[in-house]
């Protein structure tokens, strides 16, 4: 068995009487073709859902990736932020990179689940058939912690808060 992990990555390997169960061979480390589709930072549909409201989302006025914790945006928001974008691409195997995100992420491409990540790297293998020629849809849900909703705690008051949401850059890199 061969195993290659990037920083922060982990896997579970279960040994038993029937052999080793490793799940799908994701081949995330296949060679890149050099073809990249970069998704713009602007033009996203961004919706939010607070923990007790989930799975109901409310659309925001924001349309650009970047920290929603910035002053004048949603600095006290705790919950899930949904990012939706239509983009042009071709069919093929690829890796979707979300760049930076805070914290846990779930991703769908054209309605198919691409995966989950609780820490960087926010990379998702897009199997053959997930991307189609022409218009595609990416949905990424980024969930932060409850720290921002409870920042008035005397112990947390002076801590520097992490960003909220999808910071990017977001890109699709094609694989052989």
PLM-predicted stretches and their roles:
Residues 1-23:
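C-terminal beta-strand-rich structural cap/linker in extracellular carbohydrate-active enzymes
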Residues 1-3, 123-129:
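Exposed aromatic-hydrophobic patches
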Residues 5-7, 91, 132-133:
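Surface-exposed loops/turns
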Residues 11, 94, 134-136:
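Exposed beta-strand face motif in extracellular beta-rich ectodomains
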Residues 20-81, 128-176:
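An acidic-aromatic loop/edge-strand motif
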Residues 77-88, 122-124:
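Short beta-strands within extracellular/lumenal beta-sheet-rich domains
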Residues 87-110, 138-141:
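Aromatic-lined ligand-binding clefts that engage carbohydrates, nucleic acids, or primary amines
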Residues 114-115:
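Short hydrophobic beta-strand segments in globular cytosolic domains
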């Amino acid at each position: 068995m061969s195993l290659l992990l990037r920083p922060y990555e982990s896997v579970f390997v279960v040994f038993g009487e029937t052999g080793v169960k490793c799940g799908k061979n994701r081949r995330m480390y296949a060679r890149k073709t050099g073809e990249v589709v970069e998704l713009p930072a602007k033009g996203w549909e961004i919706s939010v859902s607070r923990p007790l409201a989930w799975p109901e989302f409310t659309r925001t006025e924001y349309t650009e990736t970047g920290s929603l914790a910035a002053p004048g945006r949603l600095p006290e928001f705790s919950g899930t932020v949904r990012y939706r974008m239509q983009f042009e691409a071709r069919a093929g195997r690829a890796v979707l990179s979300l760049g930076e995100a805070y914290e846990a992420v779930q991703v769908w491409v054209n309605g198919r689940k691409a995966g989950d990540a609780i820490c960087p790297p926010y990379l998702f293998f897009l199997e053959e058939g997930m991307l189609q020629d022409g218009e595609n849809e990416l949905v990424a849900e980024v969930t932060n912690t409850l720290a921002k909703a409870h920042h008035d705690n005397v112990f947390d008051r002076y801590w520097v808060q992490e960003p909220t949401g999808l910071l990017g850059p977001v890109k699709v890199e094609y694989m052989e």
